[in-house]
């Protein structure tokens, strides 16, 4: 189709364009290569092109059911912005009066039909501005506006909104050095790109540039393409920004925000070519995991899945990892780095994965440095040899259990600090891989997925279950294999997990009780000194167990935050952020009573309410530590004394402003509890 319409003779331009538009009605949404090459379009021609691309050509009058009453609380603001928009276009008074009415009606009806409020910071007038140049009827103006809002403007396009966290991860993936520079300056994408995204660049581009850009963009029918266009804008601005290192934050933000204004109409073709190139170098998970940003989908995400603000790097799904290296060389191919301990890796791992024991990060840094060097050399050699395991894109895989992936996250942070591009993390880790192979539910030894998992241990006995060996070919297939691996990897922790659950149940006593002998957890043996201490977090216990490893969904209770803060037995209230091993943070509150420490995690969807995330007896606190470089990051370790020594049963980490004061009051309360126990 592109060949048929790309080159036209000047004399028959109008007719050829009309024919091309007519024939393109069914093709624009399915054939991304079928972009009609346009130039010097008249308003009616451009209107026809855009309406076909937006799939509103011939659509009925949505406004016909409306009574036309302009009575919203923010109506004065809507009228003012509508008048301002027409004034900017320099339209004669008579014609302008009708257009003001059209714009005000479109915005008002959209607000009423979608039950939203118009605010001064919205980019809607910028979206309407290019549409007004098409001389559309009020009906078509609304239909085009609605289609653009619905298909191309992402949800949560607000300050600190999810699209901007996603864009930061995309920037980090391709331009880690520039991303790090902006992070250092505390310049977030929403500070410079909120109007880019909210108006498809019309807020900052010249009218003729916006028209040329939309001519192509609307035909591409790809809402995620805006992120790659934004990326190219930043890549082009990077050199000028980096030399402004001495400038203050506001000046840099202003320079970034104005970058699209430098575009000219003849730049558009190159802009899209580069955007498509970067798109081809980006994991598809960016789209698939965030597809509900656009369109009419009202699919709700889990609270934790929605928060991209604290993600270390771009997450990639296990199915994409498995499929990617079967693609042609020009696609995204992953060099998978398995960061689990050697014991787990040897028990079973992705056949194409390179092993990097992240525990070495703390236990043997020099050996880790050699391993990293070997990793990069292996990646280089695999690329040169065209190995099935080769990939330009590094994807780190952990176990999928937060408490075990702490060191992997540190290794990952190390690579990011070195400005290594194309760095991602396998979403859900090795556990997600096991689950995916089980979910495909294909039985039999000939299943093509069987080769994905291999064991490098000398004996398979540790992986045996009641139905045979790991490498048996008795027809059990993938499910059997996965079940055995899951059994082997989890069996060792069953007893510990049961102990921890019992421990939490036994310490979840009502806060109204006073300290008594029944409150003791792990009463010290005769002659054994209390093990509670406060120190710097340089020494890690290798057997520590994060409390998040226990499924506590059934125990979570929803409470009113203020009601709990005001309880008479709450002695101290400490606002904080709970920090998970994945790097995610959740606004929380620590409440200290005479005997316990409670963590209330705020519920984003229910303001003023929180989950009771954890209850810990103060006399079970073994150690409170902090990082030298980040004194506000506090780690609490909880445990028991027994004949073998101290058994760590839970670890919790919090980011606490004025951490020194907070730990002081907690320590004082702990000492009171210990003194009471000693004297009882």
UniProtKB/Swiss-Prot annotation:
One of its GO terms (cellular component) is cytosol. It comes from the Eukaryota. Transmembrane segments: none annotated. It is found in: Golgi apparatus, trans-Golgi network; Cytoplasmic vesicle. Disruption phenotype: Morpholino knockdown of the protein causes reduced brain and eye size and curved tails at 48 hpf. Residues 40-221 form the Rab-GAP TBC domain. The keyword Oxidoreductase does not apply. GO terms for biological process: brain development; embryonic brain development; retrograde transport, endosome to Golgi; vesicle tethering to Golgi. Gene3D superfamilies: Rhodanese-like domain, Ypt/Rab-GAP domain of gyp1p, domain 3. Keywords: Cytoplasmic vesicle, Developmental protein, Golgi apparatus. This is TBC1 domain family member 23.
